[in-house]
Amino acid sequence: MQKRFFSIVASLVLMLGCALGSFAQGTSRYNIIPAPAKLTPASGDYVLSRQTTVYAKKAEDVAQLFVDKINKATGYDIKLSKKQQAGGITLLLDKSIQGKEAYTLTVTPNGVTAKASTKQGLFYAMQSFLQLLPPAIESSIATQAPNGWKAAACTIEDAPRFEYRGTLIDVCRYFFSIEQLKKHIDVLSMYKINNIHLHLTEDQAWRIEIKKYPELTEIGAWRDTENGRYGGYYTQEELKDLVKYAEERFINIIPEFEMPGHELAAIAAYPWLSCREEKVIPRPIWGIETIVMCPGKETTFQFLKDIVDEMVQIFPSQLFHIGGDEAPRDEWKTCPLCQKKIQELGYKDEPGSPKEAKLQSYVVCEMEKYLNKYGKSIIGWDEILEGGNLNKSAIVMSWRGDNGGIVAANAGHRVIMTSSQGGLYVDYYQGDPAIEPQGIGGYAPISKTYAYNPVPKEVHEKGMDKYVMGPQVNLWAEYLPNNDMQDYRLYPRLLALSEIGWTPNEKKNFEDFSKRLDSDACLRLKEHKVNFHIPLPEQPYGSCNYEAFTDENTVTFKTTRPEKMVYTLDGSEPNANSTEYTAPLKFTESATIKIATLLPCGIMSKTRTVKVDKQTLSPATEAPANLKNGLRVKYAKGSYYKVEDLDFLTNWEEKEIKHVRNLGGLTQGDYAAVATGLVKVEKDGVYYISSNVIRAWIDDQVVVDNNNIACKTSRPNGRSIALKAGLHKIKVVYFNVIMAGRPASWSGSDVLFRYGKDGDFKSIKPEDFYLD
């Protein structure tokens, strides 16, 4: 009886362990991303060895990709077997499995069996199997697994929640090489992403060779920057090779050809495409261009059709993106040809639907009909809904929040959800902007991406879920000038997209996802040489690398997801054995904190250096006689990018201004300006300074230093300083130039003050600036 009792208890414990294991994967044995729909743990491991055999009937190409990968990492010479063998790995096509991407995977100590009704399903089964092996299986050179090439035994029954799981890659603002795109394809396919939306045409560049219109790449692929001519393009053969590479990994490449807006690069090559036919250049700055294509000309439509004729020969995708977003229609209002076309079509203004919006809808519908002849379905940004008359076959990509997707799905359109408000714009900041690389703005930490549900409740409540094809993250490239930055923005948020697109919503668990990410997936990304984002230690009151104090100072750190932090106070670089941060650090003397995030897998973030500086209050300056409000400014015309450029200038002009905000607009064109004067502070204490100017000083101490930073956005990059109440010297350097596509005027020239660590940064009142 006692034996039977213990047997029952043991069985219950095993059952409970299996049940918990199927939900909480974040252990050393099961770290698959995206989490499978159903995973049942089992005891033991399958061991990959030189004697392992791989058999695949009618799926040899999938099996060969798998074999090539494991041979490269292990140094083995495994070959495909002509027959199924005991103890081997078997891939079988089984038509009884429902769903083209569904699969089953059975891993035991005695063998591995993957089944699916399609090769794509088998490919995904093997991606899951690879994630059961040590992360070093992703190595590009032969290596060793310290504990052997073991895969934890389990049974998986899996299928995706959504048919569409996508990533937009913008190759126009900055050019991605074919090699970089292939690297992304390798990683995306690991995580069961099945669509790349390739953004090929823009105001800033045209990236695809079109043989009928050679000047699109001769002129349109290149733009002028402060560093000279920049650009590049893909030949048709290069793109065909890329498409083939992606198809082998079951990724569909969807081309985007913007129309009628975002096409200044094409208009630069062929000015007759616009209403005014003026000679222009590819747009050297970011933002929305007001010059768009002219739909009043039949030659414009012929151009669009000619481009499509060549693009469909390169991209076999059944989906074709025609853009349609951010197309200002102002020129159409005064263009005789556009107005004539509107009259011919009988369009009139209606509430919420001006006739020019209907003209844009006409462009969409005409091109949809043309693409339909090739068997293509169009995708357009959610603005294509605005003119009405949109065919039900058109797919709407909802980017301005969820509303476009809600309206479209409830009207019977298929939709792809890529909400800029839902964490799916991965060019947004994923940590405190004060310490993160320059970005376009916004805030989308990985927790926000992971929390997104592609089916809005307004769609679900009406039973229209079936119209939601799935989610997509968008990697816009305005602030991604190199491969490292492209990686940094996309990963690991791409893995969160993978899970929200694949895993059943009720099985999502961010804590468990984070464990799988931090303990396993990050090692796999490292093997692919991906420069992924690791949360940096941040100060919750606003990160600052230079904290002044007068008596004592407490410095607090956090991370955007719970991670271990380690630090030193002796000037040395922190490592895995350094002191763990567990509570706020208190200081009564000056010190230097070096602090970094340490992931469970042993990978560390870059080090933050935070100086805490004990200061006496900087004394106030005695007020000059005849105190007068304002600032003195000297400015010199020309393009300057570093403070050192000013050392030898002699062409200064002088004037007075009322506020540092007035440093913009001093004169036409590029110029440098230096403002000097006095600023009044109301009370004794430590002040934190924030500004986007090049450099600023208070009482001859540098408090802002953005010198030689290429991309400026509204982010603090300042210090703190202890000041006595009263007047203090201030000096500000401002460059009115375009840096890496961003005019300085967009960021402004204000200098903001915050008293202490609490509260908000505020602009100084004009009456608190004085001439010195």
What are these regions (language model features)?
Residues 24, 508, 514-680, 686, ...:
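Short, compositionally stereotyped local motifs that mark structural "simplifiers"
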